[in-house]
């Protein structure tokens, strides 16, 4: 992702974020059979673009109570210094105007606007004050802040690439984020025949092993709506 419009230098750009999204889209089409016209990929998305596409996704959900929604994001995250609430940072947003970004609590609320069979969130980002790049968007004085994360609602399941006090790294050899690379590899190896619990467990173990080798360990996280019983077995 290119954050140059915020006035920041190129070091805070997120390497391979667009590549992550394009490859994830390919697997949604080829492995899960998602119709091509029902997928939107938005490279270098501004806040306005992200809100617009979220509205499109919610409107799609309004047409079918058996709909399954997928939201994937690769890029920067951070948390509000005052509230500790985590946000996704579109390319025109920095830590200084973070509340104009996409808060995770608002994202979960939007995805639960209408009854759906399932809403699945995949986040290759971190919210600790560390970033998927060579430099931070805001000086944190070396302190990583654990964000205050709201729970998903309705039939919503959220996978994220690292725990609240960790950074998410990029896999330069593969030109992807570590989390996205192993997420897609796990889906590919299982030929799409895998439960959500198995997908999380296998991806998490692979990411943890690979990032331990570079001494930047990531422990992916899974959060499910407390009212969604049986999500573990969904394929």
PLM regions and their residue ranges:
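Cysteine endopeptidase catalytic domains of the caspase/legumain-like
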Residues: 1-235
